[in-house]
């Protein structure tokens, strides 16, 4: 399970990371053999359960990329990217924000170890509510189905360089995306 989970986590991390995307043919379904220009792909792999699940994960990642401007706008400057967690070598978890031209953000959290973190504390630059919008550990992608199925409110509790923080569920060998709504935005719609 670790091989496919690690691959899905890597694809999720790569899709959210700044820069243009490249995936050689066959990678979208977990092809084992390096790409060969003079031979066809091993399509029979799609008969096995794990390969179509990786394919579904890649399909969903492509849909998210096409419909989430934060993943492709401001792709060439620090204005569209902010490290949230880059120093947790004990847990091998990294997190960053991608922001579009309108200020909408997507939080990407990747766990590069097979250790489940049901309550991982993460610092954030603003007060708001996080909602999980993608998780490579979902059952339909071949994962263990550990996910955040509730809205997560940040608290005014400092963590590292951030004034706010919250606890999130971080599955093993997985990448999770969150969208956020700031409290000021929520208040504007409540009145």
Predicted regions and their residues:
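Conserved small/polar residues in nucleotide/adenosyl-binding loops
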Residues: 184-191
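Active-site rim elements
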Residues: 1-2, 42-52, 162-167
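Glycan-recognition and catalytic regions of carbohydrate-active enzymes
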Residues: 9-10, 16-19, 23-26, 30-106
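Carbohydrate-binding surface patches
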Residues: 85-124, 174-179
């Amino acid at each position: 399970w670790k091989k496919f989970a690690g691959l899905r986590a890597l694809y999720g991390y790569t899709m959210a990371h700044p820069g243009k995307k490249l995936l050689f043919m066959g990678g979208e379904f977990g092809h084992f053999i390096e790409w060969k220009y003079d031979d066809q792909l091993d399509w029979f792999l799609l008969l096995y359960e794990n390969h179509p699940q990786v394919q579904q994960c890649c399909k969903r990642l492509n849909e998210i990329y096409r419909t989430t401007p934060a993943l492709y706008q401001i792709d060439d400057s620090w204005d569209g990217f902010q490290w949230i967690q880059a120093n947790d070598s004990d847990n091998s978890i990294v997190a960053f924000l991608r922001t579009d031209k309108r200020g909408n953000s997507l939080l990407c959290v990747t766990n590069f170890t097979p250790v489940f973190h049901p309550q991982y504390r993460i610092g954030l630059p603003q007060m708001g509510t996080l909602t999980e919008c993608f998780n490579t550990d979902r059952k339909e992608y071949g994962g263990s189905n550990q996910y955040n199925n509730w809205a997560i409110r940040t608290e005014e509790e400092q963590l590292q360089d951030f004034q706010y923080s919250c606890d999130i569920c971080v599955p093993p060998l997985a990448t999770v995306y969150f969208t956020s709504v700031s409290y000021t935005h929520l208040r504007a719609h409540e009145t």
